[in-house]
């Protein structure tokens, strides 16, 4: 209610998009007519904004208020495992082209640019690889592999060991026992595991690790043909800067 009150007067509408056995929350902010009239030829008419690991559609569409011009309609949505969808019990799924296509179908959009924020930087790549209606890609910023967020805070010598463990989380009982204890010493890890359970609907850390293994750009190599703008931070707390080379290779 507070968000809607703050946005009073904007050409912004809420939508409930049927998906699976539930609904995806979406928000659409119509283009500024003057900006659209002055936009160069070839400017996309629609920009779809993809959410993050712990975001809501309201949060991400507010990001668009900082755009210097708005020549396109902006659509932000909570996909499975995100925001309002997660609260309703709809778990995260790796085939991100499916909710993306559902959103484009609902609004009758034949072609759209797509921007992904944080974890959305991976999701937008997955959608682009399998949804040709995505015409342009912005990863703000890049995310090659979701599991990097668990290993990056570790000292460099320990990362290969951690990679091996989370890449093959067996025996499950040992992984579960270790990850019940480790969060006591790291508030960051405790939050990540709590949020991961919330997104996936899974209770055991070993199950979460196996599920998160699906979120990697490795199988997308050669499938993304759209123009891509990839941003990277050299002090990102979740994404190793050296992953930029892996992203380049995938593209």
Located regions from the model:
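Active-site nucleophile elbow and catalytic-triad environment of alpha/beta-hydrolase enzymes
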Residues: 202-220, 226
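Alpha/beta-hydrolase active-site loop
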Residues: 59, 89-113, 122, 126
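N-terminal cap/lid segment of alpha/beta-hydrolase-fold proteins
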Residues: 2-41
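The serine-hydrolase catalytic nucleophile loop
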Residues: 53-65
């Amino acid at each position: 209610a507070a968000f809607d009150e703050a946005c009073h007067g904007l050409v912004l509408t809420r939508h409930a998009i049927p998906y699976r056995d539930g609904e995806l929350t979406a928000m659409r902010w119509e283009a500024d007519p003057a900006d659209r009239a002055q936009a160069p030829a070839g400017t996309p008419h629609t920009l779809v904004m993809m959410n993050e690991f712990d975001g809501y559609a309201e949060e991400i569409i507010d990001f668009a208020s900082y755009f210097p011009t708005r020549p396109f309609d902006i659509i932000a949505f909570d996909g499975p495992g995100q925001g309002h969808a997660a609260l309703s019990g709809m778990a995260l799924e790796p085939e991100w082209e499916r909710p993306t296509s559902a959103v484009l179908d609902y609004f009758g959009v034949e072609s759209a640019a797509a921007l992904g924020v944080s974890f959305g930087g991976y999701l937008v790549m997955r959608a682009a690889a399998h949804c040709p209606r995505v015409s342009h890609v912005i990863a703000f910023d890049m995310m090659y592999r979701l599991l990097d967020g668990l290993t990056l805070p570790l000292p460099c010598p320990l990362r290969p060991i951690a990679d091996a463990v989370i890449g093959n989380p067996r025996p499950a009982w040992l992984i579960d026992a270790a990850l019940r204890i480790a969060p006591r010493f790291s508030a960051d890890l405790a939050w990540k595991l709590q949020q991961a359970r919330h997104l996936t609907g899974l209770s055991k850390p070993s199950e979460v690790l196996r599920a998160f293994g699906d979120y990697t750009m490795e199988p997308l190599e050669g499938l993304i043909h759209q123009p891509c703008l990839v941003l990277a931070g050299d002090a990102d707390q979740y994404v190793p800067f050296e992953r930029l080379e892996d992203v380049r290779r995938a593209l």
